[in-house]
Amino acid sequence: MKAQGETEDSERLSKMSSLLERLHAKFNQNRPWSETIKLVRQVMEKRVVMSSGGHQHLVSCLETLQKALKVTSLPAMTDRLESIARQNGLGSHLSASGTECYITSDMFYVEVQLDPAGQLCDVKVAHHGENPVSCPELVQQLREKNFEEFSKHLKGLVNLYNLPGDNKLKTKMYLALQSLEQDLSKMAIMYWKATNAAPLDKILHGSVGYLTPRSGGHLMNMKYYASPSDLLDDKTASPIILHEKNVPRSLGMNASVTIEGTSAMYKLPIAPLIMGSHPADNKWTPSFSAVTSANSVDLPACFFLKFPQPIPVSKAFVQKLQNCTGIPLFETPPTYLPLYELITQFELSKDPDPLPLNHNMRFYAALPGQQHCYFLNKDAPLPDGQSLQGTLVSKITFQHPGRVPLILNMIRHQVAYNTLIGSCVKRTILKEDSPGLLQFEVCPLSESRFSVSFQHPVNDSLVCVVMDVQDSTHVSCKLYKGLSDALICTDDFIAKVVQRCMSIPVTMRAIRRKAETIQADTPALSLIAETVEDMVKKNLPPASSPGYGMTTGNNPMSGTTTPTNTFPGGPITTLFNMSMSIKDRHESVGHGEDFSKVSQNPILTSLLQITGNGGSTIGSSPTPPHHTPPPVSSMAGNTKNHPMLMNLLKDNPAQDFSTLYGSSPLERQNSSSGSPRMEMCSGSNKAKKKKSSRVPPDKPKHQTEDDFQRELFSMDVDSQNPMFDVSMTADALDTPHITPAPSQCSTPPATYPQPVSHPQPSIQRMVRLSSSDSIGPDVTDILSDIAEEASKLPSTSDDCPPIGTPVRDSSSSGHSQSALFDSDVFQTNNNENPYTDPADLIADAAGSPNSDSPTNHFFPDGVDFNPDLLNSQSQSGFGEEYFDESSQSGDNDDFKGFASQALNTLGMPMLGGDNGEPKFKGSSQADTVDFSIISVAGKALGAADLMEHHSGSQSPLLTTGELGKEKTQKRVKEGNGTGASSGSGPGSDSKPGKRSRTPSNDGKSKDKPPKRKKADTEGKSPSHSSSNRPFTPPTSTGGSKSPGSSGRSQTPPGVATPPIPKITIQIPKGTVMVGKPSSHSQYTSSGSVSSSGSKSHHSHSSSSSSLASASTSGKVKSSKSEGSSSSKLSGSMYASQGSSGSSQSKNSSQTGGKPGSSPITKHGLSSGSSSTKMKPQGKPSSLMNPSISKPNISPSHSRPPGGSDKLASPMKPVPGTPPSSKAKSPISSGSSGSHVSGTSSSSGMKSSSGSASSGSVSQKTPPASNSCTPSSSSFSSSGSSMSSSQNQHGSSKGKSPSRNKKPSLTAVIDKLKHGVVTSGPGGEDPIDSQMGASTNSSNHPMSSKHNTSGGEFQSKREKSDKDKSKVSASGGSVDSSKKTSESKNVGSTGVAKIIISKHDGGSPSIKAKVTLQKPGESGGDGLRPQIASSKNYGSPLISGSTPKHERGSPSHSKSPAYTPQNVDSESESGSSIAERSYQNSPSSEDGIRPLPEYSTEKHKKHKKEKKKVRDKDRDKKKSHSMKPENWSKSPISSDPTASVTNNPILSADRPSRLSPDFMIGEEDDDLMDVALIGN
């Protein structure tokens, strides 16, 4: 065993030894050690290779550790530098000494010099082929251990050479960049040497901005724009002081200059091109050497201006840039989105931590004492029908250094626009129902223009500020407000604020505060007002005829441009055009000193109307109906016959408010108070332009200062009286608005009831004020003194130019009329609408073909005197501007109180007034002719809007009953047809009254001078004007507004004015078609169509809707479908305020009170329907519901001047309201009545057919309910071009009612013929258009042609045209007649006689007979219904189917029988009254809704009161007086009076204005008697 075990062990050992031997043998070979090390390294490297993710993770961890380590030693610094180099893909190595670290690439290297302790010594950068150059910026970064910034520089250097090609090509590209940088640096030095500009000047104006040379990895930087907010420290809110050594790189907007590879080849200079060191011209343009092959090279690269963040630019900007550089901006076509959406994203992305914000384009701004909500209407259509599109631009290509200054200027322009829009974009979140939250709508008008619409700070109306970014440092601003709106501030003030802050919220806050300060300053003017009032009482000028504004009635439409659109110049022969032109609100009107004087002096206006327009107006006795007398005799001609006129012309110039406050943009503003679009609408009405140029919306502005002062004073005196509230509202705006604003604002609801008690004294006072002409030098002196004092007064804002102008604007828009309308308005109270006669006044205006226009000129204020506006204006806008300039408006504070009242009632109470009654009576006959008022009322606007519209075209709305009618007549006498004006806007007394007033004056001045006198004696005319204010009680507003409006601006009733022939339009009862308007509908369309219907409409609680109804009643049936569409459209867009259709839709209430179903809608009164819709919108704020109480909105007010379109625009942006339709309103409003489709058609119609046709077209297009409204106003053009513009305006704004001027008598006749009346109030604009048809006051059936847009009635209209083809007194009126297309609903035909009686009572002569087509439904007055169908509610004749009571008929206006209270009087004018009633009745829902400030309850109460009064009046007046609810039902109310009474406001104020049926009834006879007997 042992041996065996040993053997095994030995074997093992041997085996092991053999293995060891083999191992030893193997590894004993000669293998070098280096080989072994290499093998180990390879093994180690293979192990290190891990997944790429893991590797990156480790690297990031190492870098994080590196950053966390403090660099305090040389090794730590070199390690960090090497780490940074690796991060940027660069190589790095250390010098032998270890104190230099080199970071390298193929094209450059960076040398970092350190000391042994690791401290930095220097940093040098060496580009390819160059010596290293020290870079101070990199030295600073590394010394501060700011390694992140150092890394950015390295990245920039890498990107600089991120070019195609080899190193040689890259070197050439670098040389090209260097040469460009040298040239740009020379340009910067040249600019600095030439201007010694500070850093901020370089940024904003420098040819290459503030230039920072390329340094390290930072490219050459051009700082080209910095907004004021950029210059505030974000943390401390303290201003950043810029100096050469302290201009933060991140400040403002920057662009870097670089070169990048491109797919195309470009010849780029590789050597500097600038020769010498001095500029070649005074624009700092250097002289460049030519680009040749010697100094340039073709490279696959180009120069670029690159932006840190892509900039939103408009489509137009892209095209301009490409035209400038000659190089496509994008290699592939970009995707275009709404520009405002891009701007919103751009602004929100500035937040360092941008979180998604669900804004829906609604943003909130919390400012000291105010909270704003801004709705950016990104989809609003531009004039071309497209929304404002844009795209993002991140870089701009260019080849030559000389292109850089041009590019920078273009970018600055775009960025300035973006800055303003972006100022609304905040991340602030507020609750929708936050108390006091103010709504604003920002809507694009073009690539450089936009509008901001908001509620008037004082009045319940829509105001629009149009901002035009002319360049990066100049922003022109224009405030569009209702003529009767209180003063807000001047355009210059707004422009200064905008340019100082470049922020919309800050500007809106400043505007509001400015309005408040102006309002606060009003009381200081009370003493002056009293003095002026006394003077007026002692020196009452003769009542002036409505011809004043008409002087340019036939003026061809000179091309007018509105912020939004440009209307092609074209002859708009009728007043209508003038109305539109009025809008000259452009202010472009500058026919001469005389004209401005005219526009400034209501008295002067009335005088001119009487002398010059008497013939030209439809019913003017001198001119045969078929003649379209020269637009009104030239001013010179008119002045020859009137010494007083001569005096006014002499005195006014120097003391003209325009002159006194001429510098103040307010005047210009007010003159262009119409919506931006309205301006476009305003056509060639030179007279209007003249008048409106200064203060289209505020005639009084144009009035002599005396007039302005008187009205202001009277307003002041009356301010204590409730009636004054309403009255003042309208007047204050017209006049300098010294007293009106306060009184208006001061007396709230109480004013409505009170008006009746105080009306007479107040009104008389007011009347005298309006007839400040008689005051002459005394008043002028006083005014001038006031103006001087005002200018001396410390302005609330330094920015504000002389406030006098604004004040004046205010007054012009409301003051004059305010005085005229105030008393009446108050007298009228609920039932007595001083406006009742306003319808008559308007009728008178209609009587003269040109009268409408002049009246419009004169009464644009009146028309614009929506009670709301006046009240609110006096409170804020009116008072503010005026006070800023001077403390003339002592009563502004008073008005403040009244404003809410008036707004609530919408001037209903104002309509009724004891004095107002008689005055209206006087004008009540004229009312018959002034059916256009109804048309105006037809406007979708609420009472205020209606009032405005009405008073412009007709005062039917105003009529609250017989009493109201009588008032209107008297008013008319006093106020040259102001009565008609006042009649127009019971609901929105102030505004509509103003509007009405302009048209009314035109038509009425001629016809109504005698009545005026009568009214003056009553002392109501001036106050009548006031009644138009939106705030005035509905009843009061209706009556007082129209008469006051016309009377105030023209001449006081007391003054002995050359007799003005009365024009009565007799319409067979059978002709009138009765509609069944719902009694409560805003404006019953049916009432408008038929006398009976009109009246019933009037009886509607809401006079404004009544009015619309009246005018549309006849029309309704034929155009039900149209109306409904229109209605809908209107509703969506503030239509109610801005569209006659809106009212009409209510009038259409015949069809159930639904806008869509309303008969008016059918005819194009659909606008009226929209008005109805508007009402609901009104809830958010008056802004939202301009048509209801917004009629007073500044843009709307300007409607009388022709800015109705503009108004529409402002109206459209109601933040609270759905933006869809409205949002578009501002853009399209001006050019066409309807915001969208309607607009274009409306404009086209207007231009083609005179004003008349446009309205019709509008109405025809349901989608264009807004357009309908504008169109209508143009239809009013027969004698009231203004109507058309109003209509457009109203459509867009809902204030268009005020826009409708009084149509000429011809227009009324035309309406009667065609039964177009139906559209009257309801589709204020549509009616206007029909009125336009009617407006061929000359009795031309031709007006139907103009109304062609209503296709249905066109043929009929044309027939009428044949009958009346010769009646072109209105100029455009004949064309208006053409609108018969809408008449086709009228089944039977009647003959309407136009009776023109002389003021002295001479036997009346029948100037023309018109065949009336009666809608199947119309009972007696075919004319009326047909006109309604044509929706010429704007025209007095059409409005009132009853011939006698046509607005144009002075006798009717004068007729004492027609008391404002008397519904019967109103019923005489029948449909006219109905229309007027609709317009007048602030009580109308439409009117009420727009007045958020004024409780709807008050409005309703007012309406009820008005209804009660009207009912009483009707009962008294006629056995067949219908109850407010009943009258609308009867096709032809047994008694026109009854129908009128139905609408308390309307009936009282506009009895004569009722539908033809009613007129044909006893009313007709009465009116005829009055016309025959004389005033």
UniProtKB/Swiss-Prot annotation:
Stretches the record annotates as Interaction with VDR: 542-789
Protein's UniProt name: Mediator of RNA polymerase II transcription subunit 1
Modification sites for Phosphothreonine: 805, 1032, 1051, 1057, 1217, 1442, 1459
Motif residue range(s): Integrase domain-binding motif (IBM): 875-902
Subcellular location: Nucleus
Biased segments, Polar residues type: 655-675, 808-818, 1158-1184, 1331-1352, 1427-1442, 1450-1484, 1527-1545
Regions of compositional bias (Basic and acidic residues) in chain numbering: 696-706, 963-974, 1354-1366
Quaternary data: Component of the Mediator complex, which is composed of MED1, MED4, MED6, MED7, MED8, MED9, MED10, MED11, MED12, MED13, MED13L, MED14, MED15, MED16, MED17, MED18, MED19, MED20, MED21, MED22, MED23, MED24, MED25, MED26, MED27, MED29, MED30, MED31, CCNC, CDK8 and CDC2L6/CDK11. The MED12, MED13, CCNC and CDK8 subunits form a distinct module termed the CDK8 module. Mediator containing the CDK8 module is less active than Mediator lacking this module in supporting transcriptional activation.
Span list, region Interaction with the Mediator complex: 108-212, 215-390
InterPro entries, alphabetized: Mediator_complex_subunit_1, Mediator_Med1
Region Interaction with PPARGC1A and THRA, annotated ranges: 622-701
Region (Interaction with GATA1) residue spans: 622-701
